[in-house]
Swiss-Prot record:
One of its GO terms (cellular component) is cytoplasm. Keywords: Acetylation, Cytoplasm, Isopeptide bond, Lipoprotein, Methylation, Neurogenesis, Nucleus, Phosphoprotein, Prenylation. The modification Cysteine methyl ester is found at C387. A motif (NAP1L motif) lies at residues 125-150. The modification N6-acetyllysine is found at K116. It comes from Rattus norvegicus. The modification Phosphoserine is found at S10, S69, S143. This is Nucleosome assembly protein 1-like 1. The NAP1L motif is required for the histone chaperone activity. The acidic domains are probably involved in the interaction with histones. Residues 1-32, 131-163, 345-390 are annotated as: Disordered.
Length: 390
């Protein structure tokens, strides 16, 4: 028994010696290593662990435990800072209201350009040679001889086939080239070939913030509407119950429109036949039932929000996606439609993701090189005294 006590005393003396060594003035790698040793020894000490656990128990379920422990006079000052933050949110809300006013102002300046785009797409206006001149990127430039040869070949091809009017299937191609392609089903495509234009209209000055998406169609065999609309209601003010969550204007709700489908042309519905067997008599009958069908045109019939504002999970997910699509159409598709028609906008988006991927790959390669290095010691990269500040 005495031998065991002597052994424990010897180990304790050794631990104390190690601690004293760490306290000596040292520099470089030895200091880091011994600091880690000291940390390990402290975490193995039952008394230290007990004190730490007691401290943590006092903070259970209280993410702001430090705040709660502050003196009352300091808490009062923190409350003053919160009131300042609310005023900041109110100023920010005014800022976004003025941004909306600027959008309305500049929409008037954009409109003549969008009108001419509409006329070119729909063969109302034929652009001049000067308007059709486009200087390609440097990497796409070719010699004048090749240009002339290509021009002659194009002219021959044009002579061989009927001259198309405007830019056929412009908006359908825009949708098929983008993430909206998931919304467009095969049975939607013949209808979207008749889509002539998409416009965005902002609410008038002094009116509640909102915008309307207008889809203009030429006469077709599917419905009688000339224009289908989707209205989005917005809010740009902090919520009184949660003012710190304000992060700019948000879409609060949306309203679609009724589509006046011609008989048998409603692509949002389908008829299914079910066979039902009578339990008692064993007879079988066929029942016809109309059910909803996946279609782009369901976009104009969003879920209705009850007066109490409660929606089931499916309806909430649909509305959240709907808001994203409405915002995307307004901010990207309508102002930059030609780039989505050609696919250049998609390439730009892909380039952004590729750059991120390349950076990640490079980081991965560097990590791999270190791990394959026989002299690499991962412990040397660890420094418990450092942490990242966000």
């Amino acid at each position: 028994m005495a031998d065991i006590d002597n052994k424990e005393q010897s180990e304790l003396d050794q631990d104390l010696e190690d601690v004293e060594e760490v306290e000596e003035e040292e520099t470089g790698e030895e200091t880091k290593i011994k600091a880690r040793q000291l940390t390990v020894q402290m975490m193995q000490n039952p008394q230290i662990l007990a004190a730490l656990q007691e401290r943590l128990d006092g903070l259970v379920d209280t993410p702001t435990g430090y705040i709660e422990s502050l003196p009352k006079v300091v808490k009062r000052r923190v409350n003053a800072l919160k009131n300042l933050q609310v005023k900041c949110a109110q100023i920010e809300a005014k800022f976004y209201e003025e941004v909306h006013d600027l959008e309305r102002k500049y929409a008037v300046l954009y409109q003549p350009l969008f009108d001419k785009r509409f006329e070119i797409i729909n063969a109302i206006y034929e652009p001049t040679e000067e308007e059709c001149e486009w200087k390609p990127d440097e990497e796409d430039e070719v010699s004048e001889e090749l240009k002339e040869k290509a021009k002659i070949e194009d002219e021959k091809k044009d002579e061989e086939k009927e001259d198309p009017k405007g830019i056929p299937e412009f908006w359908l191609t825009v949708f098929k080239n983008d993430l909206l392609s998931d919304m467009v089903q095969e049975h939607d495509e013949p209808i979207l070939k008749h889509l002539k234009d998409i416009k965005v209209k902002f609410s008038d000055a002094g009116q509640p913030m909102s915008f309307i998406l207008e889809f203009h169609f030429e006469p077709n065999e599917y419905f009688t509407n000339e224009v289908l609309t989707k209205t989005y209601r917005m809010r740009s003010e902090p919520d009184d119950s949660d003012p710190f969550s304000f992060d700019g204007p948000e879409i609060m709700g949306c309203t679609g429109c009724q589509i006046d489908w011609k008989k048998g042309k409603n692509v949002t519905l389908k008829t299914i036949k079910k066979k039902q067997k009578h339990k008692g008599r064993g007879t079988v009958r066929t029942v016809t039932k109309t059910v909803s069908k996946t279609s782009f045109f369901n976009f104009f019939a969003p879920p209705e929000v009850p007066e109490n504002g409660d929606l089931d999970d499916d309806x909430e997910a649909i509305l959240a996606a709907d808001f994203e699509i409405g915002h995307f159409l307004r901010e990207r598709i309508i102002p930059r439609s030609v780039l989505y028609f050609t696919g250049e906008a998609i390439e730009d988006d892909d380039d952004d993701y590729d750059e991120e991927g390349e950076e990640a790959d490079e980081e991965g390669e560097e990590e791999g090189d270190e791990e394959n290095d026989p002299d690499y010691d991962p412990k040397k990269d660890q420094n418990p005294a450092e942490c990242k500040q966000q």
